[in-house]
């Protein structure tokens, strides 16, 4: 099984990756002995001191020339909907270099023109297939080469697929149900590969995009069948390999597979906060930006649903939110100093940012 190693390797990350003091350089023995004898703990950093090589100095200069003072962001699912609107907001500040992780580079180029992205010199599209673990690893390797030693400041796990109308499971390149792999497992793998590097950044944040449908305490999650329910994760424990399609090990249900995957992504943010926030300084959070009823996410729903669902959400439930507004909300969680707190679930319903959304920011989320 490919799933078990991904999960277990992440939970067993070597703590040494986040820093520990050890006496590695014999030439500093005397100085360290004197420092320890005098309890001058401030000198202990010398135990790890390694003179920078010419190669490292050149790489640092190249990185400074390439990125300047901008923060480096990876945003998945940048070529449509929420991702495109969020990228535009990030670029508009001039403070971020955005790496758009997308499946279709030609489509991404068209969206850049259509959305009239500002500061295009600060945007770099890179290929990523979330239905392939190998592609995730390849993307992370390419990113490492691209950033020239600069630490990653933001990782926004936004990309997702929704296949509620399927009567049978579609499987990924790794023979795992597509929604579970794209929405959850591949993002999980990406986090595990990039997190040690992000710990070097001064103000790192990892943001996962959840869904109200994964929260059974809400009308959208607990009042609409099927309800997200992982049970004892028997499907995941069994390896999630075909023909197993559901995390709970039960028969396939397209809508529930989506809800379960989003629930796992939100739970992951909480788990990461509990296990790694203090060690790494990374702020882990998840967000539900409101119901983007006109989102391309619903492209596989029936035509009548796509026509009437936005009307229902706008005039009956009040939960409707425009893509532009949702993009601003995701941008805020990645950028706003008020959103630097870790372990927070940022949740908006409908309405403008000046209403309940601003109250959520002031209260520190949910």
Question: Where are each of the predicted segments found?
Answer:
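N-terminal chloroplast transit peptides
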Residues: 1, 5, 10, 17, ...
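Rossmann-fold NAD(P)H-dependent dehydrogenase/reductase core
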Residues: 46-298
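Active-site rim elements
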Residues: 251-259, 312-320, 359-365
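Mobile gating loops/cap/lid regions near enzyme active sites that modulate substrate access
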Residues: 297, 301-309
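Acidic/proline-rich low-complexity IDRs
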Residues: 9-12, 22, 27-33, 71, ...
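C-terminal helical subdomain
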Residues: 310-359
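Short glycine/threonine-rich loop-to-helix capping motif typified by GTGT followed
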Residues: 296-299, 358-360
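Polar helix-capping/helix-linker motif
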Residues: 114, 132, 335-336, 361-366
